[in-house]
Amino acid sequence: PRSAYEVATRFPNLGLRMQEHARRAKSCAERLAELGASVIYPGLASHPDYSLHRELANRGYGAGGLLAVDLGSAERANRFMEHLQNKEDFGYMAVSLGFSDTLMSASASSTSSELDEQALLRAGISPGLVRLSIGYTGLLEDRLEQLERGWRAATG
């Protein structure tokens, strides 16, 4: 009964939540790119498959809520995530994707840790790659400022 209740009360708002999820992810991707970060997000014109994405995707939902940023090293990636979680309350380090708050992980040391170095490189996963599933809680401008402070703490 509890699961049925959860589905019945949350499903009607799923479309709105996904639109906000994607809108915020694009804003975060743009802010990181402005800071000089190497960002992977199909909603950015710099993405190699940007045109294909625009051709195939549902325009109402943007490019989704998941992005990746390469900080250049595992040390920087960890500093970035630790700062965002512990100093900014920006989100949580976790290997999951679906949550109302932001979730982040360094794929090379989490979801893909069983791969050797060569396999990671073939898959495009560098030691400094951080995957962010952007949440839709809090004020967007506050979240962008937190993200920028996290970037500066990791790279400055």
Walk through the language-model features, giving the residues of each.
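Structural motif of enzymes handling amino- and sulfur-group chemistry
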Residues: P1-N78
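FAD-binding core of FAD-dependent oxidoreductases
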Residues: S3, M93-A108
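Short amphipathic alpha-helical segments with coiled-coil-like heptad repeat character
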Residues: S27-A33, E88-D89, L140-E145
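Short Gly/Pro-enriched turn/cap motifs at secondary-structure boundaries
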Residues: A57-R59, D89, M93, L121
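A generic structural signal for well-ordered coil/turn residues at beta-strand boundaries
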Residues: A63-G65, G98-S100, S126-G128
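PLP-dependent enzyme catalytic core of the Aspartate aminotransferase-like
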Residues: A74-E75, T102-G156
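A common structural junction motif
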Residues: L84-G98, R149-G156
